[in-house]
């Protein structure tokens, strides 16, 4: 598929009716690091037990399969276009970002094209940073682990909001108009409240990690 955000691989695994999705990524780490993520046919993270079995096989240094037994690889064109359209239709059709100025920090990573493009197509004025990947500068002094540059850009450009992704675009930080980082639990709470007011929060339930503040339960 080529360089893609991790969520795009999740979506495309199901969309293309594949049996398995594989993402090569070190997430928010520097370029020297690397890792691998697996998705099942529904685009969901595979079961932990299966991950452990795969790790065991790798540690045991299983014999390599000869190339002739592997089949062949082919590239599918315009997968980014497919994911772009999917991402856009998750936004209500009556919602426009017109008149909103957004700083988008893409961490010199996989979303360096797609995030600014989607925001502009939704009507926003976009100030892009971290959009010049060279294979070595991913997550370097930018993105969700180093939001200071984006915070400064929000103030310098009188932006309404800042969005910081990590290298593979599966985590996000928000910056308010004053250049301050938005607390993730508060963001979840605000979204939940908005959906409750529209009677669109399924079962009036929010799913959060164990790291989230218990105040969300109130």
What are these regions (language model features)?
Residues 24, 104-107, 165-167, 208:
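Active-site flanking residues adjacent to catalytic metal/cofactor-binding acidic residues
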Residues 32-41, 114-116, 170-190, 216-217:
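Short Gly/Thr/Asp-enriched flexible loops that form oxyanion-binding sites at enzyme active sites
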Residues 1-33, 117-175:
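N-terminal small/polar loop signature for handling phosphorylated ligands or for N-terminal nucleophile
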Residues 6-10, 111-112, 214-217:
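Short, well-ordered alpha-helical microsegments
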Residues 52-85, 89, 178-218:
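Proline/glycine-rich low-complexity loops and linkers
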Residues 34-157:
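Gly/Ser/Thr-enriched, mixed-charge loops and adjacent short helices
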Residues 101, 162, 205:
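Hydrophobic "anchor" residues on beta-strands that sit immediately upstream
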């Amino acid at each position: 598929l080529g360089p893609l955000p991790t969520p795009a691989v999740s979506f495309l695994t199901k969309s293309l009716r594949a049996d398995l999705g594989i993402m090569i990524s070190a997430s928010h780490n520097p370029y020297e690091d690397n890792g691998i993520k697996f998705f099942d046919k529904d685009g969901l993270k595979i079961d932990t037990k299966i991950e452990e079995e795969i790790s065991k096989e790798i540690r045991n240094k299983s014999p390599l399969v000869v190339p002739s037994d592997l089949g062949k690889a082919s590239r599918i064109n315009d997968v980014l276009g497919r994911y772009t359209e999917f991402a856009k239709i998750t936004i209500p059709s009556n919602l426009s970002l017109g008149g909103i100025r957004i700083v988008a920090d893409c961490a010199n990573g996989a979303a360096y094209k797609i995030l600014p493009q989607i925001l502009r197509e939704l009507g926003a004025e976009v100030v892009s940073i971290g959009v010049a990947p060279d294979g070595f500068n991913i997550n370097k002094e930018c993105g969700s682990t180093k939001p200071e540059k984006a915070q400064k850009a929000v103030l310098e450009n009188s932006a309404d909001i800042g969005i910081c992704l990590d290298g593979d675009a599966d985590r996000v930080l928000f910056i308010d108009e004053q250049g301050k980082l938005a607390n993730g639990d508060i963001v979840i709470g605000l979204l939940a409240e908005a959906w409750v007011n529209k009677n669109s929060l399924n079962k009036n339930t929010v799913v959060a990690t164990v790291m989230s503040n218990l105040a969300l339960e109130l």
